[in-house]
Amino acid sequence: MSVTKKPDLTDPVLKEKLAKGMGHNYYGEPAWPNDLLYIFPVVILGTFACVIGLSVLDPAAIGEPANPFATPLEILPEWYFYPVFQLLRTVPNKLLGVLLMAAVPAGLITVPFIENINKFQNPYRRPIATTLFLVGTLVAVWLGIGATLPIEISLTFGLF
C-alpha cells in the first residue's frame, strides 16, 4: 500500500512541465538512505563545528566573584522570562497578571477551532493564525525589551 500520490502522466500540463524539466516530484525522496546517511551527519558535524568554533573564538567571561552581602538593585530573570516579568511588573492586580499569562495558551488552543474551515497550510492563506503569530511575537518582543528598562518608561520606551 502506497501513501504517496502517483502522478497523472496523461495530463497535458504535467507533460509540458516535465518536458521543460519543471515537473513536480510526486514521489518525494526516501529518508533512508539519503537523509540518515548523508544529510544528518553533515548537519551534526556542522553544528558541532559551530559550537567548538564559537567556544574557541569567544570563551565565557569569568565575572567578579560572588558577594552574598551586596545585593543588586534589581534582579532580572533570564531573558526568556522578560515578557512575563514585564507583564507581572506593570499589571497592578497580580491575579489579573496571572490570568493574562493563562490567556496566552488558551488563545493559542482556540486558533485551530476559529480557523477550522481553512484547509491550507500556506501561512499566506491562513490570515488569522498568521496575524495572531505576528502580533504575539511583536508583543512579546515589546514586553521583553521593556523589562530591561525602568518601570516608568518600560511600556513606552521613553518615546512619549
From Swiss-Prot:
Q: Which SUPFAM superfamilies match?
A: a domain/subunit of cytochrome bc1 complex (Ubiquinol-cytochrome c reductase)
Name where it mostly resides.
plastid
Q: Which organism is it from?
A: Tetradesmus obliquus
Protein name stated in the entry: Cytochrome b6-f complex subunit 4
The transmembrane segments are: 36-56, 95-115, 131-151
Annotated PANTHER family? CYTOCHROME B (PTHR19271), CYTOCHROME B_B6 C-TERMINAL REGION PROFILE DOMAIN-CONTAINING PROTEIN (PTHR19271:SF41)
Q: Which NCBIfam families match?
A: cytb6_f_IV
Is Membrane there in the keyword field?
Answer: yes
- The answer on whether this UniProt entry bears the keyword Electron transport reads yes
UniProt keywords, alphabetically? Chloroplast, Electron transport, Membrane, Photosynthesis, Plastid, Thylakoid, Transmembrane, Transmembrane helix, Transport
UniProt subcellular location? Plastid, Chloroplast thylakoid membrane
Q: What family is reported? A: Belongs to the cytochrome b family. PetD subfamily.
State its role: Component of the cytochrome b6-f complex, which mediates electron transfer between photosystem II (PSII) and photosystem I (PSI), cyclic electron flow around PSI, and state transitions.
- Pfam families documented for this protein: Cytochrom_B_C
HAMAP family (UniProt xref): Cytb6_f_subIV
Per the record, its GO cellular-component terms are:
chloroplast thylakoid membrane; mitochondrion
Annotated GO molecular function terms are: electron transporter, transferring electrons within cytochrome b6/f complex of photosystem II activity; electron transporter, transferring electrons within the cyclic electron transport pathway of photosynthesis activity; ubiquinol-cytochrome-c reductase activity
The processes (GO biological process) annotated in the record are: mitochondrial electron transport, ubiquinol to cytochrome c; photosynthetic electron transport chain
